[in-house]
Regions:
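C-terminal beta-strand-loop-alpha-helix "lid" module of Rossmann-like NAD(P)-dependent dehydrogenases
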Residues: 1-216
Length: 216
């Protein structure tokens, strides 16, 4: 869609979708939500369907590696988190957003978008006043704290979103398959009814012809 040289990247968009289809609107809903993100974004796709979608649309990708949602590990999430926070710290993008499917129940799953970075931590007026009165010098520096803690936070958020997305995919697929099974059963019932009607009509026609022939 555009190169780094053409425009600055405003955000990194982590998009979690499924590895397979036959899950109702699960993949379509989260990909549609991600497509609504405005600005020049770089995409980190997780899930085969997510990778295929953004490759087809020639999006700027954070990595060329195809990460399967069902197989991604905690260790891989920590590795991604370190790369993400390092890119954010260097100013390669201004924000990190996460699009995934929140698991509400077996019947309900919702595609959502959340902002992971920057952290929204607005202090209260009391905290501001206490900070002004305080003469305490905190160590280590905020830079060291960011390097140590934020990657763990990002990894936890990403892995939690992956787990919810996988659970949502399984629930959506089960619902879709239940609906397909029910529809197939109803279709079989209708076809049996049509078959029995046609068979009965043929038998009635044969009896009518036999009776008519006997009367002659």
């Amino acid at each position: 869609m555009r190169s780094r040289a053409c425009a600055a990247i405003s955000a990194l968009l982590v998009v979690i979708a499924g590895d397979r289809g036959l899950a109702g609107g699960y993949n379509a809903n989260v990909l549609k939500l991600a497509a609504q993100e405005s600005g020049n974004v770089e995409v980190l796709p997780i899930g085969k369907r997510s990778a295929e979608y953004f490759a087809h649309h020639e999006a700027e990708l954070f990595t060329q590696e195809v990460l399967l949602a069902a197989d991604i590990s905690v260790g891989q999430c920590f590795q991604l988190a370190r790369q993400i926070t390092e890119g954010y710290r260097k100013g390669e993008f201004d924000a990190v957003k996460l699009c995934y499917t929140r698991f509400d129940s077996m019947m309900t799953q919702t595609a959502v978008s959340i902002e992971v970075l920057p952290l929204a931590m607005e202090p209260t007026e009391q905290q501001k006043a206490e900070a002004r009165r305080s003469q305490i010098l905190y160590k280590p520096s905020s830079e060291e704290v960011f390097s140590a803690i934020i990657p763990e936070y990002v990894a936890g958020v990403v892995y939690g979103a992956v787990c919810e997305s996988v659970a949502s995919e399984l629930a959506a697929r089960r619902t879709a398959m239940d609906a397909a099974t029910k529809n197939a059963g109803e279709m079989i019932d209708h076809l049996n009814l049509y078959y029995n009607r046609a068979r009965q009509a043929a038998i009635t026609q044969e009896i009518t012809e036999i009776v008519a022939g006997a009367e002659i």
